[in-house]
Swiss-Prot record:
Gene3D superfamilies: 4.10.410.60. GO terms for cellular component: cytosolic large ribosomal subunit. Keywords: Ribonucleoprotein, Ribosomal protein. It comes from Bradyrhizobium sp. (strain BTAi1 / ATCC BAA-1182). This is Large ribosomal subunit protein bL35. The gene is rpmI. InterPro entries: Ribosomal_bL35 (IPR001706), Ribosomal_bL35-like (IPR021137), Ribosomal_bL35_CS (IPR018265), Ribosomal_bL35_sf (IPR037229).
Amino acid sequence: MPKLKTKSGAKKRFKVTATGKVMHAQRGKRHGMIKRTKKQIRQLRGTRVLFKTDGDNVKKYFLPNA
């Protein structure tokens, strides 16, 4: 049976660390930021770790070879 392909949308959105955690970028920074405070915009920088169950699902269904 051939290997499952990685979903290309998931490749762009998620990154798996060496310890197996799944990182993702914060949502809500594309548009409409005029109504947010500077503090809110600043706190949306960087990446966050997905919850373990969500990360397991992402690895199983979208990033099978990660």
